[in-house]
Amino acid sequence: MSADTATAGVASRLAAARVLTAVFDQGRSLKAELAATLPGIGDPRDRALVEAICFAVIRRRPAYEVALRQWLERALPPRDAELKALLMVGFAQLEVLQLPAHAALSATVDACRALGRPRQAGMVNAILRRAQREGFPAVADDAGWPSWLRKQLRADWGDRAEAIFTASAQMAPMWLRVQRSRTDPATYVARLAELDIVAHTDAVLPDAVRLHNAVPVSQLPGFAEGDVSVQDGSAQQVADALTLAPSARVLDACAAPGGKAAHLLERHPGLQLVALDVDARRLERVQQTLQRTVPNALVALQAADAADTDAWWDGRPFDAVLLDAPCSATGVVRRQPDVLLHRRADDIEALCALQARLLDATWRTLRPGGQLLYTTCSLLARENQAQVEAFLQRTPDARAQTLGAQFGHAAGAGRQRFPGEQHCDGFFYALLLKAS
């Protein structure tokens, strides 16, 4: 191993420990911390390592906490948060990533010294060697879930909740969506095979490719040209749920990061799409996505709160509305494991109130006979079937349309897919028709 390689290895472990400290002890978002950290790491392999370590540690944190309580003579004080995170970085390398033990131990111990804690290097080495010998204590699949959320999911779904916890503890696959005007799934799978990337088409999702192992988008042929996008299978089904005329006027009310809007425009190039997002910075992501995939599409982008129609709506009704509402994200814990660290019980009441405002406001913009598709990546009945039922009760000109079993299990007036089903994320769909 060269000196440069060794230095990069230490820097990667340090970077992962610092990201994790920000997530665990400062309440920061994993996505935001990685976005701030990874661009400063030159080698894409090191960037991938930091990301993989962080996800692995957050998923396995309950077991690692138990191990540290058993193996440390005394608990580490709060000032040693980075040191504790570094120990977990070592654990993840050994258990989840299964890196060669000598490399994992050496780089992590050296990272301890680089952290300015040379006196703790012996302790770190001893703890990691014990982990290597003994493995980690078994913990229940729901161990990382807040008690209020465990209770709520069991109340909503009964025995099915255990399968939710088990599936949510797994790593999510990488799904791609091909642009049919450029290629097709079978052809793209063959292109990937030429690069030794194993992938599969899907019998239910006509535009989908699922990778056996995730890869950086820079390794995906045609990504920059718009041949393919990264999008979970559940999100891809949004385009299947809406029936659209060739030149329909469509509102995407909460559009960021833009994948669903792009898919609709790929399917229906003549759409007149208005894409909103309350966050101007996130709307820039939408613009970048659409520029890469459908640069000639008819799209109006507006940084606006969809619930405040006076601020953005010109009074012309829409033929269809997609309301992918802000939610608890409990269906995507596989992809966002830090949701379980940051989500609070009182968040749900605020989210439900926001969802109701968005439903009422966007419904007013829909023409008679038009369709509104309400979706979330939540598993909670309050945000999903109960939210839709309350809307139907207060909205005389709304009725639910039936979606097929390919969208998941019947849940009130909608459909619920659970994490891991069809290899997809947890997702809720409800299709609502406005009376003519």
Curated annotation (Swiss-Prot):
The reaction(s) catalysed by this protein are:
cytidine(967) in 16S rRNA + S-adenosyl-L-methionine = 5-methylcytidine(967) in 16S rRNA + S-adenosyl-L-homocysteine + H(+)
Please tell me whether the keyword Phosphoprotein is annotated for this protein.
Answer: no
Cell wall biogenesis/degradation: is it a keyword of this entry?
A: no
Primary localisation category: cytoplasm
One Pfam short name: RsmF-B_ferredox
- Where is the protein localized? Cytoplasm
Q: Name its GO BP terms in alphabetical order.
A: regulation of DNA-templated transcription; rRNA base methylation
Q: Which InterPro entries match?
A: MeTrfase_RsmB-F_NOP2_cat, MeTrfase_RsmB-F_NOP2_dom, NusB-like_sf, NusB_RsmB_TIM44, RCMT, rRNA_ssu_MeTfrase_B, RsmB-like_ferredoxin, RsmB/NOL1/NOP2-like_CS
Which UniProt keywords are present, listed alphabetically?
A: Cytoplasm, Methyltransferase, Ribosome biogenesis, RNA-binding, rRNA processing, S-adenosyl-L-methionine, Transferase
User: What's any one GO cellular component for it?
Assistant: cytosol
Name by which UniProt lists this protein: Ribosomal RNA small subunit methyltransferase B
Species annotation:
Xanthomonas axonopodis pv. citri (strain 306)
Q: Which gene encodes it?
A: rsmB
